[in-house]
Amino acid sequence: MKKSTLALVVMGVVASASVHAAEVYNKNGNKLDVYGKVKAMHYISDDDTKDGDQTYVRFGFKGETQINDQLTGYGRWEAEFAGNKAESDSSQKTRLAFAGLKLKDFGSLDYGRNLGALYDVEAWTDMFPEFGGDSSAQTDNFMTKRASGLATYRNTDFFGAIDGLDMTLQYQGKNENRDAKKQNGDGFGTSLTYDFGGTDFAVSGAYTNSDRTNAQNLLARAQGQKAEAWATGLKYDANDIYLAAMYSETRNMTPISGGFANKAQNFEVVAQYQFDFGLRPSLGYVQSKGKDNEGIGDEDLVKYIDVGATYYFNKNMSAFVDYKINQIDDDNKLGVSSDDIVAVGMTYQF
């Protein structure tokens, strides 16, 4: 049976948050697209720090300029504005801000606030309607997710020689003038992704290694000089089915109460199916376990089953529900919340 037009559109939207960005200018080799979304959302939970309105707006632009037939300049900026705060509160944050150059088959090089190399793997399981992707990927946590001071080189199809083999090389400069858990020393990262020449199956791997700061080594937990991580992932995306799994390990990197975990073992898996009429149910599992932590030994940092669904009215409008079934023990020695959360809401995106 032929897929409906709606199903094809939805699969495109899921594949890229900005796939249907609005083109506002395209002339003489210069192009500018804008994109964004309004997520009107409410959390229901016994955890008072989570329960309540979670509405926010995201907005961004992507631009490029054709310098010559080989060289293209580009830039991207994205911000988020909280919709659940008083007007007097400062609630804006910059998610992405980078610019760079792309030289045809030789790849692209950019600098700024960007996604870390480890997230090239972790993104495959960060697909739940609301939750997910939080075992090892955290904002401003070395190169696990969005971070500042990143110089990033990306190459697709390995210089045009191997279809489907993509490579990332990344360097992160020192960031110290912030909370110790958000700091980082100089570091590097790399990732490889291969889809076997355009098949529906792909594998990926990533590695990062960074210096830790003096302030981080003064914290009670994890005093190693280096923060290190590796990750590997598998993905299948075809026939309306999406399946992905990720395993990673971090050392002296994952934040916990009192500092960082000496070691964390992280696992995520997600399964989704796209119905022709717009419904996309989702089932997943996320776990992060801290190992050999000072004073407490091994303890779960994140552990939950996720059951959710998104209904796409069209490419711009959707409604969702996401149930985070927490598996953390009530007597968790790190004080991690053990309460369930249900997220319900609607999203308008362009």
Swiss-Prot record:
Gene induction: By phosphate starvation.
A GO cellular component annotation in the UniProt record: pore complex
Keywords annotated in UniProt: Cell outer membrane, Ion transport, Membrane, Porin, Signal, Stress response, Transmembrane, Transmembrane beta strand, Transport
Record-level Gene Ontology MF annotations: porin activity
Secretion signal, residue range per the UniProt entry: 1-21
Main subcellular location of this protein, as a coarse class: membrane
Any one GO BP annotation for this protein: monoatomic ion transmembrane transport
Cited function: Uptake of inorganic phosphate, phosphorylated compounds, and some other negatively charged solutes.
Protein's UniProt name: Outer membrane porin PhoE
Originating organism: Enterobacter cloacae
